[in-house]
């Protein structure tokens, strides 16, 4: 699941002076491009009246600083290029004294500590965005008036190339490198093959491409091919007859001209409050009162068409929006940051900063904690500017959003699973009052260093080899009793008398199991009393048993041996794997054991969605998935089948894991699955309707609690109300209306408690009648 980490401050830089002028940004930031790839650690921050600073996110420190005059202001976000030890930062600045806008280049060497600031004249035009072409070393300049120009590194001059609609208001500019947009790449390639491209500017630029490629910008393809497919996309709005229309223009870097214009066909009645373009320009996201609308590029109509609308809470209070990945939006509303899942439409996590922030930039890189692609996550830092200073908030996102992640309940922060072994070791399912915890076991194992059990272990080993199970159980229980009596005083410290040293318990466990000819686990010594004691007192270690390197499942082995022991193993073993739980679910489905299924589902809900899904895929076949899907659907639909110990959320989470594992094709593979899905959908929709109706009763119930004492204390004359079902606008008048509605004669002669009870019943009855109306 997606989640935030804990905030930490980098420096005391902050927004002191407020800028309310149009086309001026008070503060902004960007991520360094290292050989054309976004760096996960280096960011650049510019703050009005204070200067430009570079920070290292991993070390959480200031890396370099470029102080500027006090009255310096900015018109665009900076662009940050890192080539070895050299750092290059471009931005558009102006002094408030003369008001002339220029391009600022700050370059420094972190090894030799060299630094230089250079200004370039741009005829006093404000810049909207800057883009760096790594293959040619050129800088693409997008001015606020819609003009597009190039800053050539050879002659160090600005060359105008194209311009968008004169009445356009630029909203976003996005640079997409080569091969990132196949639609425009194929079109440009066909033009070059047919010889329709006769632009002299392109020929001139391609001829000089090789000499302008930076040494650090090494690529595996030629610069000519790279520049032929690189595009700059401009999202802008145009006012036509009091109607705002949105368009996306495609600017070819190689041809240096606008190649096409695509319209955004909005479905909203009113103009959206926020509009955003994806990084590859194939999607448009708009936020309005109707919800979050997602538009996708339609090839035939050459426009952006609506594909779905997602509804979120507090959608009218949004102040800032950023596309943090392909599946998540970073939203700021008031002082809160939130991660919105745009796959299923859920708010994954919310972080309250206690004060309104300014989002500067964010880093994003693939986590290397897990090797498998489906387990990989995106992690990074969000840089925000607060009154106290510059701060960063870490976050983590799943690369592929699963349904189970959308419906799962978060119980922990970054770096932790939904359930931990410590919680399971405490016995969250079948915890006994006198049962020991893993902490108590470890504490006693450290405090009580006993070597007298070695002789007992040797004798038990000989009994196990002889398969004398009766004497083995008697011998083991005798050892336990003598051990408890010997250390009775020490056990008072731990408040338990049922603990053995953990190494001794693990040694006993290894005597009970062995491998057969097919390398499968089997109970070689059927000492059920000993095995039951180890499992019930949580001394059984699954991790120790796994070291034998067997194939198959421990649960299946115990289930064949004795069903009660297998059930206790499922509930009381702290380090059990998700695969063992999946095997238990499969056994419960095939044998129709409802109690076993409930316990297995409860244990499965403690794992993260990816681990649970992989365990099910490893243990199940398609026929087993069909049976499990129908069974879980019945548990969700029929409340009589569900256990009182586990809430409905557990079943819904496990059902979502099953749906992720089956996929759309698996659900649609049979008519029975489709019928079960239809019944499940109708039932969940009915439950949501009932919950909505119940939520309307809450104000009336709170009114009862708030006014009950006041009603008892009041002694006034009551009169009958001629309109008992009149609509009450103010909830505070509800109790007064009901007191007038019911005849005061019925209250005469009754006790104070009886009168209060009658009023409570009347209020509840009135509430039900109003809901029916």
Curated annotation (Swiss-Prot):
Q: Does the keyword Cytoplasm apply?
A: yes
Biological process, per Gene Ontology: maturation of SSU-rRNA from tricistronic rRNA transcript (SSU-rRNA, 5.8S rRNA, LSU-rRNA)
Question: Which residues are in coiled coils?
Answer: none
Q: Does this entry carry the keyword Thylakoid?
A: no
Where is it located?
Cytoplasm
Do you know which InterPro entries this protein is assigned to? Utp8_b-prop, Utp8_C, WD40_repeat_dom_sf
Listed GO CC annotations: cytoplasm; small-subunit processome; t-UTP complex
Which terms are listed as keywords in the entry? Cytoplasm
Location of the region described as Disordered in the Swiss-Prot/TrEMBL record: 192-219
Q: Which GO terms describe its molecular function?
A: snoRNA binding
What name is this protein filed under? Uncharacterized protein C1565.05
């Amino acid at each position: 699941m997606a989640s935030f980490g804990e905030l930490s401050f980098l420096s005391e830089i902050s927004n002191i002076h407020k800028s309310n002028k149009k086309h001026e940004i008070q503060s902004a930031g960007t991520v360094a491009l290292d050989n054309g790839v976004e760096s996960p650690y280096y960011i650049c921050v510019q703050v009005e009246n204070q200067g430009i600073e570079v920070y290292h996110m991993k070390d959480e420190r200031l890396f370099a600083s470029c102080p500027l005059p006090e009255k310096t202001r900015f018109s665009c976000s900076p662009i940050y290029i890192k080539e070895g030890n050299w750092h290059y930062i471009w931005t558009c600045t102006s002094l408030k004294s003369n008001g002339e806008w220029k391009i600022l280049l700050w370059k420094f060497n972190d090894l030799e500590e060299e630094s230089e600031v250079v200004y370039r004249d741009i005829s006093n035009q404000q810049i909207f965005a800057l883009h760096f072409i790594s293959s040619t070393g050129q800088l693409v300049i997008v001015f606020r008036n819609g003009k597009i120009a190039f800053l050539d590194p050879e002659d160090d001059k600005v060359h105008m190339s194209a311009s968008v609609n004169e009445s356009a208001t630029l909203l976003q500019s996005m640079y997409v490198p080569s091969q990132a947009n196949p639609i425009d790449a194929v079109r440009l390639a066909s033009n070059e093959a047919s010889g329709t491209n006769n632009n002299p500017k392109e020929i001139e630029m391609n001829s000089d491409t090789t000499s302008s490629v930076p040494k650090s910008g090494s690529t595996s393809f030629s610069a000519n091919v790279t520049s032929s497919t690189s595009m700059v996309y401009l999202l802008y709005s145009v006012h036509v007859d009091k109607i705002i229309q949105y368009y996306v223009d495609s600017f070819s870097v190689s041809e240096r001209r606008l190649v096409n214009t695509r319209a955004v066909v909005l479905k909203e009645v009113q103009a959206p409050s926020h509009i955003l373009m994806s990084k590859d320009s194939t999607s448009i996201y708009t936020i309005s009162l109707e919800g979050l609308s997602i538009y996708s590029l339609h090839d035939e109509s050459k426009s952006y068409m609506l594909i779905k609308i997602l509804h979120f809470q507090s959608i009218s209070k949004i102040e800032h929006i950023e596309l943090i990945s392909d599946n998540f939006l970073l939203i700021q509303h008031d002082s809160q940051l939130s991660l919105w899942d745009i796959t299923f439409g859920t708010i994954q996590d919310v972080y309250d900063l206690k004060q309104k922030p300014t989002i500067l930039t964010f880093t994003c890189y693939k986590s290397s904690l897990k090797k498998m692609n489906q387990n990989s996550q995106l992690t990074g830092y969000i840089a925000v500017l607060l009154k106290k200073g510059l701060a960063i908030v870490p976050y983590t996102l799943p690369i592929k959003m699963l349904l189970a992640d959308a419906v799962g309940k978060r119980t922990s922060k970054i770096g932790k699973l939904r359930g931990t072994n410590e919680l399971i070791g405490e016995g969250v399912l079948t915890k006994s009052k006198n049962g020991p915890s893993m902490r108590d076991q470890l504490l006693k194992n450290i405090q009580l260093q006993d070597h007298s059990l070695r002789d007992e272990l040797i004798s038990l080993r000989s009994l196990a080899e002889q398969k004398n199970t009766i004497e083995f159980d008697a011998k083991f229980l005798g050892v336990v009793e003598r051990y408890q009596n010997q250390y009775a005083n020490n056990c008072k410290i731990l408040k338990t008398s049922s603990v053995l040293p953990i190494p001794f318990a693990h040694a006993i466990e290894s005597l009970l199991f062995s491998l057969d000819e097919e390398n499968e686990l089997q109970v070689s010594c059927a000492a059920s009393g000993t095995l039951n004691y180890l499992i019930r007192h949580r001394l059984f270690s699954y991790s120790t048993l796994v070291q034998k390197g067997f194939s198959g499942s421990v649960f299946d082995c115990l289930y064949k041996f004795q069903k009660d022991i297998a059930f206790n193993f499922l509930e009381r073993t702290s380090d059990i794997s998700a695969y063992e739980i999946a095997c238990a679910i499969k056994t419960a489905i095939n044998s129709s054991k409802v109690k076993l299924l409930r316990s297995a589902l409860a244990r499965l809900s403690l794992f993260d969605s990816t681990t649970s899904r992989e365990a099910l895929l490893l243990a199940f076949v398609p026929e087993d998935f069909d049976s499990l899907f129908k069974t879980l659907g019945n548990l969700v639909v029929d409340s009589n089948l569900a256990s009182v110990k586990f809430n409905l959320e557990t079943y819904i989470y496990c059902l979502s894991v099953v749906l992720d594992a089956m996929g759309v094709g698996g659900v649609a593979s049979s008519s029975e699955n489709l019928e079960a899905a239809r019944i499940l959908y109708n039932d969940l929709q009915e439950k949501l309707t009932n919950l909505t109706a119940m939520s309307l009763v809450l104000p009336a119930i709170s009114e009862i609690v708030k006014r009950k004492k006041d009603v008892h204390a009041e002694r006034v004359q009551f009169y009958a109300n001629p309109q008992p079902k009149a609509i009450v606008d103010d909830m505070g008048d509800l109790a007064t209306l009901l007191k007038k509605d019911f005849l005061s004669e019925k209250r005469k002669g009754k006790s104070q408690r009886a009168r209060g009870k009658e009023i409570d019943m009347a209020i509840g009855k009135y509430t039900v009648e109003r809901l029916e109306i």
